[in-house]
């Protein structure tokens, strides 16, 4: 009977029936079964309930209004050069367009008819369909999921987007031999058509139409025109399969620049472990981590080389292991890349004008780490505090209860033309401030370390000119990294040094992948929404429904966004730090709620349930990710020659780290056979295959090449292509964009700002003749090396040794981790207060359970209470204790829920104003009772 009850709803997830057509009694129950079946992510996407029109927003605007006639048998024939172009709009409307309006282009000679009746699309109903009981079926429940039969959605690996079979992009591809396989993926259905088109394009008698989508022309044009590609159809299919495989394998991979949930085990399983995870921390660093786990607002200071970056990486891993959502950010892109995070502006949604435009996402984290905080303006810092308090509805709680961990050195490069945050009252009074003292970088050169400490506070050390080599003014050292004042001079110096080298240059272009979800989520709901639909109100209702049976941590994200002109997509982000049982429970409850949404008067109707959210991003998401990728220091074309000097921009081994310098000695073919054995793993293998196919198929390189670099440490290795990711945070609805490129850059010259936070391995030269006096500039430049033998400088002037007096005073007042005042007066973050309360209740519950077990053992060993045969007061006492124990466990869950409800009430009261405060409190109190 239960199987028959579940079967209709289970068929929804497999056979393409709309959720709204389910019997209401089984809608919320039967959908649970979908979450328990194995999902074939290789399918690109499995689709349910094919009533919702797909395609981009522009494509939807071209759709006819509901009720228009769309089933005429008008036909556009593709057979001659003049009539080759099918106007997609005309085909979709069922109207044959005049040939003179079509652009000149040549298509395959085979006659291909596209009938509007064959690609018709059922218009959206004005109201949900009537509920009809479904005939009971006994289809298979276990095993491979059955694919839907009526889907109009297709995953296009060429563009990385979901699209409709009636969309312009799909009709364009269908006209040249593409089709849809049984996994609802785009594939080469008619290879002969593609081969014939390629032959004609190579002869110059055919071309792809100029009005086709640019992404399709760019993806196919190079392969179809490349004479070295013997079978273009097979090459295109291979290229699409590599994109899909990469998407599948990296679905749960950690985002390298992620602001948030990075799964440690996934990194280790990926092959190359993060060396910062296994690094040995000194005693001082361990104490700082333990202090941070107490939940206080913190500032971690210290001079250059005291291990702040290593500490932040280890702290982030430790906090994530505790189940916390952590945002790793920095005020500069270079520093963000170095610590494995992103910029503060991107992560927190700060506009160019300094406004926080994504306020509703700021409470998505339990802790936010900000590196290089010396470059954070006081005004932005205080605005960040104000916005978090406002969003949390807690005006008296610093940063709304979110733990803020700041790191940096105010005696290094700071913010320009604005006061630093040391002048902020909140920073001075609410933050636990400590200073790291153990020197790590210059540990083997105490005299040089002492000289740097004097420069740090604005003093000119007597031993400086004696320990550092002095060169004539205007000197450029060919064998060194030259630190110059401006980016223009740096680019000019790098280009000139490269031109001086003999031989041909090799330009290696980075491969930019497809936008995708690389995290764990629930299924995605596609909803038809009304004009007055409000995302914030809907999210509140959805969270309320989910929390009816499953407790959702405050930082867990309900992702809801507009994807069509009259539709939204909704899913729940599942942090890897949460337990598997919790994630499974959320998946089940989410599908139950999907069957309840249509009964609520909130302006939304669920029309599709899609297990995978890949390809459901918006053009705005993609544009944002493309802008971020364009600014990434590694995702730029790299021109190299034999003999050129390069800087490693990632960590390959314990000895080859970010900042290592070497020389390109050769180029070899891009293949796994040439990759060092120590670096071979599944992750590198995917990057090599992806980059090789990209260079061959899309760039037209006859032989994809990789550089062989001899580093100053003595190691000579083939540097493999590396994957870099941007995005993966609430601003982009957790979508990420990946790029595979060479983790190298020319290392003849840099600005001082670009190397702040790095340890340079090799010779470094400072050309000071064109540098203007700037506070802390000389100290930052000279502290990039481990010993004075690496360093040389020219045009040194003692007047350039400058330090800000207020920053020097602040630094001297900092305490060490062993000499802190009482922490009782400092605020504690919300996650810590909640954890302490729950821990206390659970400890009481554990004690009661232990007491009951001991009582049962006295009466009969490990026999259950029900089988003890007790009677009278003893039996009544034990039964009462069992009831109390169950109630106590229930109280634990209610306490967690009440804390979150209290936070929501405070936020609501702050918004509604003082006039409605009393009314809101009364109603909230009644609801709690």
From Swiss-Prot:
GO cellular component: mitochondrion; nuclear lumen; nucleus
Cofactor: Mg(2+)
Gene3D superfamilies associated with the record: P-loop containing nucleotide triphosphate hydrolases
DNA damage recorded as keyword: yes
Range of the transit peptide: 1-52
Phenotype upon gene inactivation: Essential, it cannot be deleted.
Keywords, ordered alphabetically: ATP-binding, DNA damage, DNA recombination, DNA repair, DNA-binding, Helicase, Hydrolase, Isomerase, Mitochondrion, Nucleotide-binding, Transit peptide
Residue stretches in coiled coil: none
Cell compartments where the protein resides: Mitochondrion
GO molecular function: 5'-3' DNA helicase activity; ATP binding; ATP hydrolysis activity; DNA binding; magnesium ion binding
Polar residues bias spans: 74-89, 916-929
Protein residues bound to ATP: 302-309
Any matching Pfam family: PIF1
Keyword DNA damage: yes
Catalytic reactions of this protein: Couples ATP hydrolysis with the unwinding of duplex DNA at the replication fork by translocating in the 5'-3' direction. This creates two antiparallel DNA single strands (ssDNA). The leading ssDNA polymer is the template for DNA polymerase III holoenzyme which synthesizes a continuous strand; ATP + H2O = ADP + phosphate + H(+)
Compositionally skewed regions (Basic and acidic residues) per UniProt: 56-66
Ranges for region Disordered: 55-89, 902-929
Binding region for DNA: 776-796
GO biological process: chromosome organization; DNA recombination; DNA repair; telomere maintenance
Record-linked SUPFAM superfamilies: P-loop containing nucleoside triphosphate hydrolases (SSF52540)
UniProt function note: DNA-dependent ATPase and probable 5'-3' DNA helicase required for the maintenance of mitochondrial (kinetoplast) genome stability. Essential for replication of kinetoplast minicircles. Involved in the segregation of minicircle progeny.
Family: Belongs to the helicase family. PIF1 subfamily.
Subunit description: Monomer.
Protein name: ATP-dependent DNA helicase PIF1
Chain's gene name: PIF1
């Amino acid at each position: 009977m239960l199987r028959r009850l579940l079967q209709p709803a289970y068929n929804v997830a497999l056979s393409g029936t709309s959720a709204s057509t389910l019997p209401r009694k089984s809608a919320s129950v039967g959908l649970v079964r979908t979450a328990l079946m194995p999902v074939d992510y290789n399918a690109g996407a499995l689709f349910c309930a094919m009533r919702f029109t797909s395609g981009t927003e522009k494509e939807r605007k071209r759709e006819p209004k509901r009720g228009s006639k769309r089933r005429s048998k008008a036909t556009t024939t593709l057979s001659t050069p003049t009539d080759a172009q099918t106007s997609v709009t005309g085909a979709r409307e069922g109207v044959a367009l005049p040939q003179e309006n079509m652009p000149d282009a040549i298509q395959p000679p085979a006659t291909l008819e596209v009938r509007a009746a064959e690609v018709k699309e059922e218009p959206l109903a004005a109201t949900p369909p009537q509920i009809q009981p479904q005939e009971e079926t006994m289809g298979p429940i276990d095993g491979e999921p059955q694919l839907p039969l009526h889907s109009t959605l297709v995953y296009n690996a060429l563009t990385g987007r979901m699209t409709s079979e009636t969309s312009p992009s799909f009709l364009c591809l269908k006209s040249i031999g593409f089709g849809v396989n049984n996994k609802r993926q785009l594939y080469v259905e008619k290879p002969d058509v593609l081969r014939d088109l390629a032959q004609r394009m190579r002869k110059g008698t055919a071309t792809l139409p100029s009005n086709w989508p640019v992404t399709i022309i760019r993806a196919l044009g190079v392969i179809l025109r490349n004479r070295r590609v013997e079978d273009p159809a097979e090459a295109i299919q291979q290229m699409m399969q590599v994109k899909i495989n990469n998407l599948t394998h990296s679905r749960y991979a950690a985002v390298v620049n992620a602001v948030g949930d990075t799964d440690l085990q996934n990194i280790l399983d990926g092959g190359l472990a993060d060396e910062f995870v296994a690094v040995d921390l000194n005693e001082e660093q361990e104490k700082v981590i333990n202090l941070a786990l107490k939940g206080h607002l913190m500032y971690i200071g210290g001079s250059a080389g005291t291990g702040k970056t290593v500490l932040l990486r280890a702290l982030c891993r430790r906090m994530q292991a505790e189940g916390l959502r952590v945002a790793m950010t920095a005020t500069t892109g270079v520093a963000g890349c170095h610590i494995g995070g992103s910029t503060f502006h991107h992560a927190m949604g700060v506009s160019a004008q300094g406004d926080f435009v994504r306020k509703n996402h700021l409470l998505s984290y339990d802790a936010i780490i900000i590196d290089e905080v010396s470059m954070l303006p006081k005004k932005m810092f205080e605005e960040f505090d104000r916005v978090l308090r406002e969003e949390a509805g807690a005006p008296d709680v610093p940063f709304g209860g979110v733990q803020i961990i700041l790191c940096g050195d105010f005696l290094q490069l700071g913010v320009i033309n604005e006061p630093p945050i040391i002048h902020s009252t909140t920073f001075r009074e609410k933050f636990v401030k400590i200073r790291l003292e153990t020197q790590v970088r210059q540990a083997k050169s105490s005299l040089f370390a002492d000289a740097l400490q004097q420069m740090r506070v604005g003093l000119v050390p007597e031993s400086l000119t004696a320990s550092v080599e002095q060169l004539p003014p205007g000197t450029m050292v060919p064998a060194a990294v030259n630190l110059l004042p401006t980016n223009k001079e740096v680019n000019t110096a790098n280009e000139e040094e490269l031109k001086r080298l003999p031989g041909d240059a090799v330009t290696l272009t980075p491969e930019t992948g497809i936008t995708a979800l690389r995290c764990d989520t629930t299924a995605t709901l596609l909803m038809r929404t009304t004009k007055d639909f409000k995302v914030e109100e809907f999210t509140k209702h959805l969270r309320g429904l989910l929390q009816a049976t499953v407790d959702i941590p405050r930082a867990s994200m309900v992702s809801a966004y507009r994807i069509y002109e009259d539709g939204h997509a909704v899913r729940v982000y599942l942090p890897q730090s949460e337990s598997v049982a919790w994630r499974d429970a959320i998946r089940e409850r989410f599908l139950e709620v999907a069957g309840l949404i249509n009964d609520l008067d909130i302006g939304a109707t669920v029309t599709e349930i899609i297990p995978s959210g890949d390809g459901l991003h918006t053009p705005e998401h993609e544009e944002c990710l493309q802008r971020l990728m364009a600014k990434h220091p590694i995702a730029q074309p790299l021109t190299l020659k034999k003999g050129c000097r390069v800087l490693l921009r990632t960590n390959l081994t314990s000895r080859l780290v970010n900042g290592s310098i070497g020389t390109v000695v050769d180029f070899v073919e891009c293949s796994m056979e040439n990759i060092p054995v120590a670096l071979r793993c599944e992750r590198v293998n995917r990057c090599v295959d992806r980059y090789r196919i990209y260079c061959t198929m899309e760039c037209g390189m006859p032989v994809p090449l990789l550089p062989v670099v001899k580093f100053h440490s003595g190691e000579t290795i083939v540097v493999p292509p590396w994957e870099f990711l941007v995005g993966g945070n609430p601003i982009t609805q957790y979508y990420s964009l990946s790029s595979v490129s060479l983790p190298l850059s020319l290392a003849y010259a840099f600005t001082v700002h670009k190397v702040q936070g790095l340890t340079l391995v090799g010779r470094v030269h400072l050309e000071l003749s064109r540098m203007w006096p700037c506070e802390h500039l000389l100290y930052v430049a000279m502290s990039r090396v481990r010993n004075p033998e690496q360093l040389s400088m020219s045009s040194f002037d003692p007047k350039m040794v400058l330090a800000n007096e207020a920053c020097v005073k602040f630094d001297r007042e900092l305490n060490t981790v062993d000499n802190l005042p009482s922490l009782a007066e400092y605020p504690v973050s919300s996650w810590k207060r909640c954890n302490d309360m729950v821990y206390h209740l659970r400890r009481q519950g554990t004690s009661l359970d232990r007491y009951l077990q001991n009582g049962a053992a006295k009466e009969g060993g490990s026999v259950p209470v029900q089988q003890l045969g007790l009677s009278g007061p003893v039996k009544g006492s034990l039964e009462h204790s069992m009831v109390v124990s169950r109630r106590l466990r229930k109280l634990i869950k209610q306490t967690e829920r009440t804390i979150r409800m209290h936070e929501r009430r405070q936020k609501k009261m702050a918004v509604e104003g003082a006039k409605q405060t009393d009314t809101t409190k009364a109603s909230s109190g009644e609801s709690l009772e």
